[in-house]
Amino acid sequence: MERRRRPTLEMVAALAGVGRGTVSRVINGSDQVSPATREAVKRAIKELGYVPNRAARTLVTRRTDTVALVVSENNQKLFAEPFYAGIVLGVGVALSERGFQFVLATGRSGIEHERLGGYLAGQHVDGVLLLSLHRDDPLPQMLDEAGVPYVYGGRPLGVPEEQVSYVDIDNIGGGRQATQRLIETGHRRIATIAGPQDMVAGVERLQGYREALLAAGMEYDETLVSYGDFTYDSGVAAMRELLDRAPDVDAVFAASDLMGLAALRVLRASGRRVPEDVAVVGYDDSTVAEHAEPPMTSVNQPTELMGREMARLLVDRITGETTEPVRLVLETHLMVRESG
């Protein structure tokens, strides 16, 4: 049997009735092609089963058409927290639409950061999406020194905003919404399980809690503030600490749904009813909140949209469509359920 000849760029051009250069521009995502011509080329590619030679394309474009999504946490936290699933989904969809793929990497220790920095600076990827950064993360400096473009997921702490691109959630507004809900439902001893204070989400959700209390003429009481790291186990410890310090607490705003779920279970174990004795509001509006017992009121943050926008900004930087830093802040809203 005669072996079928592998389709070539020239065969695609002939079938589409265009030049070889036009086919290259379509494959490389150039906007210098009319919609009708682009569709003709795509039809020819599909009909012939043409697969671009990625190695040859990389030599010409000096691009890999690959980006890295780097989560500055350990693997256990990445797969335990529902926040990351929405981000990964949004990133994947947006990159696929632009002809890019991505690799997922994690790292929190110094050794992991050093390894990651070497990989990211080694021309394996065209750009980097940075997620869940802490104040001391060295990766942005490594990328700057290597000339690799990147976009933050979340406003970075300690960095002049005008110098960087990021997509963030309105964490202050979300913290304010959660606390206002508890105030409006008649609660007066409102505690919070805040997130880590070396991350912008932890800092700003606590700020929103404080602002809501002060706006209502209520005192900000440090004894009603405990801290976790967004995980379930940290929420258990924080809720127990709050009950030891303030047994008369009548409401809790938890800065993540996992910490909110932990609060629900600790309260139940202590003999307190939710929401009759203590109301609870979480943050994420994840399936954790939806299936909690009772179902948990929670702040909805558009994580899939956040992932999409992060990917869009980065690809625009890689392709030269934008050169200036871009900053986006996405709105939150409250999903009211039975817990508060």
Curated annotation (Swiss-Prot):
Protein location: Cytoplasm
Function: Transcriptional regulator that regulates the expression of all six cellulases, encoded by the cel genes (designated celA through celF). Acts as a repressor. Specifically binds to a 14-bp inverted repeat site, which is present in the upstream region of the cellulase genes.
One Gene Ontology cellular component: cytoplasm
Pfam family, one: LacI
SUPFAM superfamilies membership: lambda repressor-like DNA-binding domains, Periplasmic binding protein-like I
Induction section of the entry: Constitutively expressed.
Keywords from the named record: Cytoplasm, DNA-binding, Repressor, Transcription, Transcription regulation
Outcome following mutation: residue 55 to T: Decreases binding to DNA and forms a less stable complex with the celE promoter in the presence of cellobiose
Activity regulation (record text): Activity is controlled by cytoplasmic cellobiose levels. Binding of CelR to the celE promoter is inhibited specifically by low concentrations of cellobiose, the major end product of cellulases. Activity may also be regulated through post-translational modification.
Alphabetical list of InterPro entries matching this protein: HTH_LacI (IPR000843), LacI/GalR-like_sensor (IPR046335), Lambda_DNA-bd_dom_sf (IPR010982), Peripla_BP_I (IPR028082)
UniProt-recorded name of the protein: HTH-type transcriptional regulator CelR
Native organism: Thermobifida fusca
Domain HTH lacI-type: 1-61
SMART domains to which the protein is assigned, alphabetical: HTH_LACI
Domain of life: Bacteria
Residue range(s) of DNA binding per entry: 9-28
GO molecular function: DNA-binding transcription factor activity; transcription cis-regulatory region binding
